[in-house]
C-alpha cells in the first residue's frame, strides 16, 4: 500500500452521487496554538472510485495520486467498514 510518500487518509463517505467519484470527509483533532483546547477539524476530499463500490456512510481509506480532474487528487484504496443500513 505504501507508494513513495503519498498521503493516506481515513474518512467517511458523505456523497456517492457522482459517477466514479466519492466525497470523503476526514476529521482530525488538533490543539489550539494559544489556549491548548482540542478542536475538531474536518475537510472534504473528492476521491476516484473506479468500480463505484463505496456507498454513503462507509469508512474508507484514500491515497494521494496524480490530479485526475480539476478537484480530484485522491483514489479509493479500500472500504474499511461498510455503513449499517437500518
From Swiss-Prot:
CDD domains found in the cross-reference section: Ribosomal_uS17 (cd00364)
Keywords per UniProt: Ribonucleoprotein, Ribosomal protein, RNA-binding, rRNA-binding
Listed GO biological process terms: translation
SUPFAM superfamilies: Nucleic acid-binding proteins (SSF50249)
Domain of life of the organism encoding this protein: Bacteria
Listed Gene3D superfamilies: Nucleic acid-binding proteins (2.40.50.140)
InterPro entries in UniProt: NA-bd_OB-fold, Ribosomal_uS17, Ribosomal_uS17_bact/chlr, Ribosomal_uS17_CS
Function: One of the primary rRNA binding proteins, it binds specifically to the 5'-end of 16S ribosomal RNA.
Subunit structure: Part of the 30S ribosomal subunit.
Family statement drawn from the similarity comment of this UniProt entry: Belongs to the universal ribosomal protein uS17 family.
Protein name per Swiss-Prot or TrEMBL: Small ribosomal subunit protein uS17
Underlying gene: rpsQ
